[in-house]
Amino acid sequence: MTRRRIEGLLLGLAAGDAAGWPSARHRASRMPEWTRRLTRELDTFAEHNATTTLPVPIALNQPPEPLRLGPSDDAEWAAFAAEAVLRAGDDTVLGDLSRELRTRAAIDLTWTAVASEVAAAAERAPEIESAVLPLRARISVRAGLGNLAAGLRPPATGHDNPHYFDDAACIRACALAVAYPGDPRRAADLAEFDARYTQDGDGVHGARAMAAALALALVGAEVETCVAAALTELPDATEIGRNARHALTLAGTSDSAFALIPLLEHQIVDHVYSYGIAAAETVPVALALATAARGRIAEAVPAAACLSRVADSAPALAGALTGALGGAEEIPESWRDACRTLSGCALPRLTDTDLVELAELLEATQPARPGG
């Protein structure tokens, strides 16, 4: 594994995150609240007056920097997961444990620390649902943290969770794969350990699949090999397993990622539920588009962004896989410059984190190969 592939993974995920239309909404959280309220009012005006001019996030008399192209929540939660890998790579901390146990201990400590912040916020609020948290997170993550704060432990924190099926852990799994390059099973096991804090069912299966695929992409495997490893983690009898196999069949009949978009839109993407973040949709879409794009990020990410229902995370998942496959050299310089720095819109403590520097740190934690 080379630093360039880790860098490609992180920058690819960030570029995909930035490419999806929800990114601007997430980044708008750094604007004054009244700007978001005004956007909602303009949307209501358009609905009531039957106008087809739809509002977008606005700055008006405020500095517009938060609304410019850049990564948002997915990239920040991937960096959150990467921090555990960094802690486990420090042999001076918990040095009496194996690296695998250190990594799991680091993950647990990370979640426990955030849950403590949730508990403190809950104590200041009349009820936990109204607590003002020092972060922004998916429903599954917020519920999982609430469960931890209430004294539950995994797998209950992920099982007793209204959004156990979403893909929050799939995003984190992409970064966790760095811990086990070339070893899809151990990468998947680590991703499941983390996923159980917030997910169950397809949410866990999807995390295992993404970790397995990324573990092989980081050592230069072909896209078909990576996708095959992902499929082994998706049971046939599950919705995510059925969707993934069908999506890949569709990819095999398509001439390009662009040609695949309508097929995925009509046969894989759900149009009933309120949120487009089900792992059973976004992971199959990412795997299929990476395959149809032949591992090329410049084709996979724009195609994923075209699927508006799943644009909150499918482009990031596709970008992580194809970014690792092609390495950092496949990320255009313009995208690299726009996406390398986190804004802190979801995790304020990660504001100004440089993903290129994070890739260097992750590479430095890798154990020495036998023979030097």
Each model region followed by its residue ranges:
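Structured, active/binding-site neighborhoods that engage oxygen-rich ligands
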Residues: 1-372
